[in-house]
Amino acid sequence: MNPNQKLFALSGVAIALSVLNLLIGISNVGLNVSLHLKGEGVKQENNLTCTTITQNNTTVVENTYVNNTTIINKGTNLKAPNYLLLNKSLCSVEGWVVIAKDNAIRFGESEQIIVTREPYVSCDPSGCKMYALHQGTTIRNKHSNGTIHDRTTFRGLISTPLGTPPTVSNSDFICVGWSSTSCHDGVGRMTICIQGNNDNATATVYYNRRLTTTIKTWAKNILRTQESECVCYNGTCAVVMTDGPASSQAYTKIMYFHKGLIIKEEPLRGSARHIEECSCYGHDQKVSCVCRDNWQGANRPIIEIDMSTLEHTSRCVCTGVLTDTSRPGDKPNGDCSNPITGSPGAPGVKGFGFLNGDNTWLGRTISPRSRSGFEMLKIPNAETDPNSRIIERQEIVDNSNWSGYSGSFIDCWDEANECYNPCFYVELIRGRPEEAKYVWWTSNSLIALCGSPVSVGSGSFPDGAQIQYFS
């Protein structure tokens, strides 16, 4: 075969291959169009299904490989989030188990751990996080000197993964302030921070990270809020705020927000005399708050909020088992309407309880005089029966170790339970004032626990840092 004949033969083969490739491409286009139209014709009542078609050099259709074809990926859109409805009761609890412990002070001996106080835990549909008010410094930083002070211009709210000590790299800044609360309504998160001078403070309100409104002091004496999570029902979030003296009559409001905007506010009603730092939880379309009386009572005041009517009432926990600190000895009879006084009495500490009839649990420091140790007490009908007594006790932190604030939280999005499992945290304060011999700073670690439906073992879970290592 001469060169010209070879050339014509090769050209003919090339043309034939090109035509074949073109025919395959046309068939692929037809297949893609038919699949696309078929996908559009499917109607679903709840979730929308979309088909994404990507054309590459090889097509895979039902595991059959064809030249130059398409990969078909299907994805399903999730349902839109819904508002939390608080339609469950509290679970029955037989004991408490630790779900997180961040050991922040132990890590802080060598790591750059942020100085915090007033920590709490709050959950949303994706999980739970720790929130805390930082002091604008780390433990080993010289600026940690003087962080015993509660209200400075350097403070702000941060969040970190629950169980992880707060560092600059893992902390998420939320807002500026020295008092805070935060809660999720099922669709978005509302946060309140309070900033400014003691006699002229301002509360800033955020919804999904955007500033929505501000609230100016109404009594010009340290406007303050819960220092733990608020609670939402059907898009409305209830928050307890106080302004006025810490050791005499103050002015408390229950405020209701929708997407960060005030829709109603009520002055405190009922027999409670003094309200600060409420620990609130939701159940049965209600919000129950166990608070701090910094003025007179060692029995804790409580607020009950009906979220369907947006109205509340207040009184005291009825039992004679006292749970504030400082406190006198337990009484044989309690009082549902009046503060129980005695020496030592004031000033108090943030605390909590779960008021659930026969399955009522109250938390308190073990020491009646100082913030040391922590225990959980099962006291059936403590919220209604002045003669109720302790039937079960579980030690959380032994009395030779420091504790601090404590508060309640609930993961309302835990679909594994047909009820709301009560949870709480304990702040483990280290440094000044109790350990001023060794350090100039004040900070904390945190431990979080949740209820168990069966009885549990025993154990103490203190902060555990050797404070002399910081000298």
Curated annotation (Swiss-Prot):
Stated role: Catalyzes the removal of terminal sialic acid residues from viral and cellular glycoconjugates. Cleaves off the terminal sialic acids on the glycosylated HA during virus budding to facilitate virus release. Additionally helps virus spread through the circulation by further removing sialic acids from the cell surface. These cleavages prevent self-aggregation and ensure the efficient spread of the progeny virus from cell to cell. Otherwise, infection would be limited to one round of replication.
Pfam family, one: Neur
Active site feature: 150, 405
Ranges for region Hypervariable stalk region: 36-87
Compartment(s): Virion membrane; Host apical cell membrane
Entry note about domains: Intact N-terminus is essential for virion morphogenesis. Possesses two apical sorting signals, one in the ectodomain, which is likely to be a glycan, and the other in the transmembrane domain. The transmembrane domain also plays a role in lipid raft association.
UniProt xrefs under HAMAP family: INFV_NRAM
Modification after translation: N-glycosylated.
One MF term in the entry's GO annotations: exo-alpha-sialidase activity
Start and end residues of each stretch annotated as Head of neuraminidase: 90-471
Note: The influenza A genome consist of 8 RNA segments. Genetic variation of hemagglutinin and/or neuraminidase genes results in the emergence of new influenza strains. The mechanism of variation can be the result of point mutations or the result of genetic reassortment between segments of two different strains.
Native species: Influenza A virus (strain A/Chicken/Weybridge H7N7) (Influenza A virus (strain A/FPV/Weybridge H7N7))
The protein's name: Neuraminidase
InterPro entries for this protein: Glyco_hydro_34 (IPR001860), Sialidase_sf (IPR036278)
